[in-house]
From Swiss-Prot:
It comes from the Eukaryota. This is Speract receptor. It catalyses: GTP = 3',5'-cyclic GMP + diphosphate. It comes from Strongylocentrotus purpuratus. Residues 914-1044 form the Guanylate cyclase domain. One of its GO terms (cellular component) is plasma membrane. Its main location: membrane. SUPFAM superfamilies: Nucleotide cyclase, Periplasmic binding protein-like I, Protein kinase-like (PK-like).
């Protein structure tokens, strides 16, 4: 009773609020323009079909557009100074008519189109091509959501696939992971279902059955019920049904389920998605009239419908059965519209406008408006408000993309008094509700008898791009829970023992004949196992492995907002070489709670802590062995998902083998091999079973020169991680040199954990590295791809590394072990215990502790350590100097200095700079008549000359692309108003110098340089890390480019803004060119720069030497400036 009373009070309060908020809704249709500028909007609608029948658009909906335009024309806050008018075209659902209308309206300067109303892909594509905004009100097609193809298309109607988000949130809320899906076999519902399947794959939901049915017609009494067979096929292995179909079909499916007897127990639930429900009255919404199938209700809509029942026995018991079935149904549908006085007035105005010109509709009965009217009204108002915002911001109301951009990711108040949205794709977004049958006792909320009603028990809303579910509350602020049929809790998606009892054991069969002693023993064992199980589960849930990223301190220099600083890049070589401990190159080093650790990044967006993952992490924590690198923990904080292993300061075995300064004698090698074998023995006997990626880089050496195996286990944790984008093709192939042929042939299906036999093969490859001190297959002299291909092919005899170097250095027992470990058939390889026996001669006479032997090695290193340090320090200083010089050439000196110091360079706005653009007129023709090497030599000579000239001015060369040359002055160091003079003098100097330039291979050709300069504001900053560039952004760059492209050969084209600064400086001679039309800028009054004050002397620059023949010099001496410049 409390629930129903709360809902009733909510409806009353909402109605009063809406009426007060909209009390002033009293539009008058206005046709006169009142002296304002006229703009036009086009309306496309399927009023009638080609045969003259009623179209898909409900009759009264047309009246919504003139109503919206009239309200906007009366509102001084919308397009003030404009008079909005419209034209409309009945498309008859003919694409050609719609596209012709759009083209015609575009030619006539219409500011937007509402429609097309029947299909939308072709008209939307055309509108996007013509850059005219189009907002549709009934289109439910998926392709139009692609903004790269339909940049000017929006729709106020939400696409039906949005209901999938509400369905998934419902399943999440009630912990339902397995469902069967029943789908009406039409395009709309198939699209929704396909979308749901994609979402299910992302969230590990399971679809037990997919069932399709042909449309069910409740009026066709001879038509067989299609649902009975579906339920018979699925009921034994299903508890939750998701239904996609019309509301009448949902009713019939629920009644069939009731007849089949599956709803009596309350173990089954039907989740229906009603996407076509157009509710106009909250009373209808709750009274089930849109679900219940009564002739009385149909008669209220249209008396003709009632005559359909004259030959059928139809009683109230059918509706009683439907109500009983609906107790096991929950429905996801759109939020309702409350029928209020404001809604009735809106309906009246829409209908009146539809009856009036230019539609001149005919109406036998007083029609009811539907959601198409709301969507059309909203579409029109949103178009006009977008035009108003664009105009107010100084934009171009005829630029469709600019207009549409003001609506993307915006929220507006719909005519339904509900807040709707446009998402980033331009699709309408509306709230959804979750309905359930709730009893309404007599006297509650004005009810005259006990009844049932469909009330929302939750709402679905989209905020910040994410859908969320909010449960309804009663008047005591308690969650309004569903009244599950014949049960207190939501039904399970699978019986506790599984659909066939496979998850439970019938202990009675085993214990029935047991004697008391056995019961006592068994009870004790059960208690023991329960204790162990609880202890194990407690260990799984303890999260002792979890690392808080805030407690991790990396040795990397403080990073900028992009994750890496330029200083890190420049000094990376320094940090590796100067580290006396020879840090592991391929891992980030850090400290966690005082322990130095190696951080291995896992390239995943998030980690799902499934049982398998937690089990892995517990196993890793329990791994303890001298030759297994200890696991410290794992961080799952985004974006720092990583695995922390103990840091071994001597680096990897691969690092040691590549370091020629470390001399490895037989005793040293024997100790390393013994450590590696002991580590593999422990790994193969543990729960991890195998490594899977064993290679020399995954064998690390600590300060005591003990070899430890790392990068093992955690296969579920790392499953699905993305490829390292920084890893090149060569590195990817090189990683496979240790992989056994059977795993190479498995390609993408290779188990992440590998196999023990695969580890034995990898061990053999490591042995060849140890005794050759070279990378695997180094003597084979083939490309990596060819080597891997031959290993994978399984040729006879198997393709393996050439052992010339190994034969000369390794003892016989090692050679025998290598050959025994790499046969093609994994079954022919020995296990690790047999390998240890084969290599036992290596340990003869050696102690397990290598420290005594290492003391002698370190003494030998001490003799040349000082000399080695001095030599490496000098090499380091040289490389550092080269790096800094290169960076100063790539970037402005002040910017390069900041980056070298590790200071992040933030983008900066410069209020006034001057930009220079130039190109060579006729360069394309000259290039076509030249060889590529001639073009390169020409540009090299020309730009060498230019670079020598600009070094005398306060300018910075931004870039050269082909024959284009770009300069800027006034940044990154501001120079007052001098920037315009610096650019102008540079331009004058370059123009004079090019007149004496000779094209080596075509000396008769006169290079015609065309220059444009402009002054204004821009933003500059460093872009990129691998090859950083100092780039300029802003309209000033575009305008400078337009000045160059609209100039003339051997002339300097100056913008009016640049002229103002030059006039302020004085000393520059300019000539008025007049108005020049420019693409995207309109007409601009521009000028020619003719010269400068003689006191501004041009610095003499010695032209760089050109390789010219005497004949070329003589030809060039007789050339003249062409008449056309």
């Amino acid at each position: 009773m409390a629930h129903a009373r709360h809902l009733f009070l909510f409806m009353v309060a909402f109605t009063i609020t809406m009426v007060i908020a909209r009390l002033d809704f009293n539009p008058t249709i206005i046709n006169e323009d009142r002296g304002r500028t006229k703009i036009h909007v086009g309306l496309l609608a399927e009023w009638t079909t080609a045969d003259g029948d009623q179209g898909t658009l409900g009759f009264p909906a047309l009246g919504a557009l003139p109503l919206a335009i009239s309200l906007a024309n009366q509102d001084s806050n919308i397009l003030n100074g404009f008079d909005v008018q419209f034209e409309w075209v009945d498309t008859h659902c003919d694409i050609n008519i719609g596209m012709h209308a759009v083209s015609d309206w575009w030619k006539r300067g219409f500011v937007g189109v509402i429609g097309p109303g029947c299909g939308c892909t072709y008209e939307g594509r055309l509108a996007s091509a013509l850059n005219i905004p189009m907002i549709d009100y009934v289109c439910d097609e998926n392709p139009v959501s692609d903004k790269s193809i339909y940049p000017t298309f929006l729709r106020t109607i939400p696409p039906s696939i949005q209901v999938v988000e509400a369905i998934i949130l419902t399943l999440q809320r009630y912990e339902l992971d397995q469902v069967s899906v029943v789908v009406e076999n039409i395009t709309k519902y198939r699209n929704i279902f396909n979308t749901m399947k994609d979402k299910f794959d992302e969230r590990d939901y399971e679809i037990l059955h997919e069932e399709y049915y042909a449309g069910f017609d409740p009026w066709d009494y001879e038509m067989d019920d299609p649902f009975s067979e579906i339920i018979q096929r699925t009921k034994e292995t299903t508890r939750i049904y998701v239904f996609f179909g019309d509301a009448s079909d949902l009713r019939q499916f629920a009644m069939t389920a009731l007849d089949e007897g599956i709803l009596d127990s309350g173990d089954y639930v039907i989740l229906g998605a009603v996407v076509d429900l157009e509710v106009r009255d909250s009373q209808d919404y709750h009274s089930l009239d849109y679900i219940l199938d009564t002739s009385e209700y149909l008669n209220q809509i249209n008396p003709d419908y009632a005559r359909l029942f004259k030959n059928r026995e139809y009683t109230r018991s059918d509706n009683d059965r439907a109500l009983e079935a609906l107790k096991s149904v929950i429905i996801v549908t759109g939020a309702p519209v409350l029928k209020t006085r404001n809604w009735d007035r809106f309906s009246t105005f829409v209908i009146d406008n539809a009856l009036d010109a230019p539609f001149n509709g005919e109406l036998e009965l007083r029609a009811e408006i539907d959601f198409a009217s709301v969507y059309m009204f909203d579409a029109t108002m949103q178009l006009l408000e977008a035009l108003d915002r664009t105009h107010a911001a100084g934009g171009d109301i005829y630029d469709g993309e600019e207009v549409v951009s003001t609506l993307l990711n915006s929220t507006y108040r719909s005519k339904t008094d509900t807040f709707y949205q446009f998402d980033e794709n331009g699709d309408g977004v509306k709230p959804y509700v979750l309905l359930h049958l709730i009893p309404i006792p007599k006297g509650d909320g004005g009810a005259t008898k006990d009844s049932l009603g469909m009330y929302p028990i939750g709402t679905f809303n989209r905020e910040n791009g994410q859908w969320g579910f909010e449960e309804a509350l009663d008047e005591d602020a308690n969650v309004l829970k569903p009244v599950w049929h014949n049960r207190d809790e939501p039904p399970l998606d699978m019986p506790p023992c599984g659909f066939h009892g496979e998850l439970c054991t019938n202990w009675a069969l085993y214990l029935g004949a047991s004697i008391p002693t056995f019961l006592i023993i068994f009870g004790g064992l059960i208690g023991f196992f329960i204790y162990r199980k609880r202890a194990y589960e407690a260990a799984l849930d303890s999260l002792v492995w979890k690392v808080d990223w805030s407690e991790v301190q990396t040795k990397a220099t403080d990073t900028n907002s992009q994750g890496f600083s330029m200083k890190n890049m420049v000094m990376s070589a320094i940090s590796v070489i100067s580290n006396a401990e020879k840090q592991q190159i391929f891992a980030t080093i850090g400290t966690y709670r005082g322990t130095v650790c190696a951080l291995h990044a896992v390239h995943k967006n998030h980690i799902d802590l499934t049982r398998a993952v937690r089990t892995e992490l517990k196993i890793m924590r329990d791994m303890r062995h001298d030759n297994i690198c200890p696991f410290i923990g794992a961080c799952i904080d985004r974006p720092h998902i990583s695995i922390l292993m103990h840091y071994c300061a001597k680096g990897s075995l691969q690092d040691i083998l590549e370091n020629d300064d470390i001399k490895l004698d037989s005793m040293f090698l024997s100790s390393l091999i013994a450590d590696l074998v002991k580590g593999i023995v422990y790994l193969h006997s543990s729960e991890i079973k195998s490594h899977g990626h064993l290679k020399s880089s995954n064998c690390v050496v600590d300060n005591r020169w003990v070899l430890q195996i790392t990068d093992y286990g955690l296969n579920e944790f790392k499953k699905g991680q993305k490829q390292d984008v920084d890893l090149g093709d060569h590195a990817k192939l090189a990683r496979q040199l240790w992989t056994s042929p059977e795993h190479l042939r498995q390609e993408g299906s290779m188990p992440t954990a590998g196999s023990p036999q695969g580890d034995i093969y990898s061990f053999a490859i490591i042995l060849t590295e140890l005794y050759s001190r070279q990378e695997p297959f180094h003597e084979n002299e083939m490309d990596l791809a060819d080597i891997i291909g031959r290993v994978k092919s399984g040729e006879v005899p198997p393709y393996r590394p050439i052992l010339n170097a190994v034969n000369a250095a390794a003892p016989d027992c090692v050679l025998s072990a290598i050959r025994a470990c790499w046969p093609e058939d994994p079954a022919d390889r020995p296990n690790i215990m047999a390998v240890r026996t084969m290599l036992a001669p290596l340990q003869k006479g050696l102690k397990p502790n290598i420290l005594d032997n290492m003391i002698a090695i370190m003494e030998r290193y001490t003799n040349n350590l000082e000399e080695l340090v001095d030599e490496r320090t000098q090499e380091l200083q040289k490389e550092k100097t080269k790096t800094e010089q290169l960076l100063h050439r790539m970037l402005p000196p002040s910017i390069a200095s900041q980056l070298i110091k590790g200071i992040a360079v933030l983008p900066e706005t410069f209020e006034m700079v001057s930009i220079f653009f130039s190109d060579i007129v006729g360069f394309t023709a000259l290039s076509a008549a030249s060889t590529p090497i001639q073009v390169v030599n020409l540009l090299n000579d020309l730009y060498t000359l230019f670079d020598a000239i600009i070094s005398n001015y306060d300018v910075y060369k931004v870039e050269t692309i082909g024959d284009a040359y770009m300069l800027v002055s006034g940044l990154p160091l501001r120079n007052g108003d001098r920037h315009a003079g610096q650019i102008a003098s540079t331009a004058h100097h370059l123009l004079e110098s090019v007149k004496g330039f000779i094209v080596p291979h075509k000396p008769e050709v006169f290079l015609k340089l065309r220059i444009g300069i402009h002054s204004g504001s821009c933003v500059a900053g460093v872009v990129g890390l691998t090859m950083p560039r100092y780039c300029l952004f802003g309209d000033t760059v575009n305008t400078a480019s337009r000045m160059e492209s609209n100039g003339l050969a051997l002339r300097i084209h100056v913008s009016p803004w640049c002229k103002q600064v030059l006039d302020k400086l004085g000393g520059y001679e300019l000539e008025d060119r007049g108005l020049v039309p420019m693409n995207g800028k309109g007409e601009i009054h521009t000028f020619w720069l003719l010269g400068q004050d003689p006191s501004y002397k041009i610095t003499k620059v010695k032209p760089p030497p050109q390789k010219l023949t005497q004949e070329a010099i003589e030809i060039a001496a007789n050339r003249v400036i062409p008449d056309d410049v």
